[in-house]
Amino acid sequence: MGVVAKQSFYNILSVMLAFGIGAINTIVFYPRAMGEELYGIVVILLAQSNILQPIFSYGVQHTMIKYLSAAPSQKEQDKLLLFSLLIPLVFILPTAVLFFANYTEIAAYLSTKNPEIAQFIYLIFLIAVSTAYFEIFYNWARVQKQTVIGNFLKEVYQRVLITLLLLAYLLNWIDFSAFINALIVGYYLRLAVIMGYSLWLYTPKVYFSFPANTRQLLTYSTLIFLSASGASVIIDIDASMLGKLVEDRYVAYYRVAIFIAAIIDAPVRAMLQIVSPLVSEAINANKQEELKSLLSKSGTNLLLVSGLFFVLINANINDLYDFIYFLSGKDGFVEAIPVVLYISITKIITAATGCTNNIVNNSKYYYFVPFLSIGSAIAVVFLNLHFIEQLGFIGAAFATLIVITAFNIIKVLIVGMTFKILPFSKQTLYLVLLILGHYYLFSSLDFPFSAFVNLLLKSSLICGSYLAFCVGLKISPTINDLLATAYKKLRSILG
C-alpha cells in the first residue's frame, strides 16, 4: 500500500471516528445538556473564531508546503520554518491590543440578537490564536510526510474534549462559563502536543535571518491569506449571519444538518492531508505525468468514497432524523432536511474535483485564488441576505451550494487551461450514474421497522450494492486493492 493510500486510510478512520463522536455530541449531549440556545451560542463563537484564524496564520502554513521542497539547502528550509512561526505574531499582537481595548464595543455588536454571547467573546480571540499555530505545526509534520497523528489531533481530540466537557456540564460539575474556559485550555493542550510532535520529527537550527526569498514568501502568504480569509468566510459566515438574523435554535438546527452533510467530506479531508505536499513536490520538480496521475486518481477515488457517503446519508435521511429525535427528544431538527441535501451536493461536487484546489494553490497561478475567494465570500454574503429572507435558515445552505459550485468550476477551468489536465474521466460518468441510481432507488425504499433497524438494513444494502458495482466495473484499482487487502486480513482473523 503506497504512502498516500496508507495514510489516507488511517486519516479516514480518524475522521470517521471524529464524526461518530461529534454525532453523539451534536445529537445527544448538546441538546440534552445545554439546550438549543446555549448550543447556538457555542456554534456562533467558534464560527467567529474560525473567521479570525486565517488572519493570524496569514497563510504561512501553505507557504511552508509550497516552498519547503523547493528550498536550495537545509539552512534555507530551517529559516522557512522559523519564518512561519514569527510572521503570525505581526498580526496577533496588534489584534490583541485592538480586540481587548475595544472589547465592550465588539461584544455589543456581536450580541445584538443573542445578549448572552457578550460575556464570552474572549473565546473568539484565544481559540483563533491556538488554531492558527496548530495549523502551522501540523503542516510542519505534513511536510515530513507524517499526517496521521496531526489529523487525529485535528479531528478526534477536540470532539473527545467536548464530550468530556459536556458530560461534566450535564452532571453539574461545571457551569457554562467553566465549560467555555475549559474548552480554551483544551485547545492549548492540543497545540502543545502537536508542537512537541512536530519538533520531535524535525527540530530546525536557529538562524537569526530570514530566508533569501522572503519577499516571494510574503507575497505568496499574502495572497493565500486573502484566499483563506475568503474561504473561511464562505464556510463560517452562515452560522455567523444566522446568529444575527434568526433565533438561536435555528442556528442549532443548521449546525446539525451541516454536521451530517460534512461526513461526505471525510475522504476529501483525509486524502488531501498527504496529497498536498506531493502535489507541491510534483509542481516544483515539473513532473507533469505525476501531477496528472495525482489529479486523476484523487478525483476518481474521492468521488467514489464520498458518493457512497452521499447515498448513505440522503437515502436514509428520514430515518436518520427519526433516530435523532429519539436520541435528542427535540423534533425541530427535522426542519433542516433540505440543508443536508444542499450541502451534500456541494460536498460531492468538491470531491469530484480531486486535488484541483491544491494544484492551483501550489502553482504559479495561485494569484487567481484570492480574487476567486474574495469574490465568492462577497457573493455568499449577498446571497445569504437574499435567500435567508426568502427561505429562512435553509436559504444559507442554498447560497453556499451556488457559490461553492461556481468556485469549483472556475478552478477546474484554470487547471484545465494551464496544465491541460482534468480530474474527470469516463470513471467519473460511471460514478455519477451509480450515485444517482442508488440515491433514487434507495430513497423510495422504506421498511416498516424502527428508525435504527431501518438505518442498519438499508445502509447494508446500499454498501453491498454500491461496492459490488464499483469492484465489478473496476472503477478504481486503488479501492479494489484496499478492499482485497481488507478481505484477506478479515479472512486471516476469522481463520
Language model regions located:
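Membrane-proximal transmembrane or re-entrant/amphipathic helices at the cytosolic face
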Residues: S443-G495
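Hydrophobic alpha-helical transmembrane segments
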Residues: L153-W200, I374-A379, F393-I414, G437, ...
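Helix-loop junctions and terminal segments of transmembrane helices
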Residues: F56-P72, V143, A257, A261-G299, ...
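Transmembrane helical elements of multi-pass membrane transporters/channels
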Residues: Q7-A23, A182-R190, I194-S198, P211-E281, ...
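Membrane-interface junctions at transmembrane-helix termini in multi-pass inner-membrane proteins
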Residues: S130-V156, L341-G375, V415-M417
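Signature of the first transmembrane helix
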Residues: V3-H62, F91-A96, F100, I127, ...
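Interhelical loop/hinge segments that connect adjacent transmembrane helices in multipass membrane
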Residues: M1-V4, E116, F176-A182, A192-I235, ...
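Interfacial segments at transmembrane-helix termini and the short loops linking adjacent helices
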Residues: Y103-I124, I313-K347
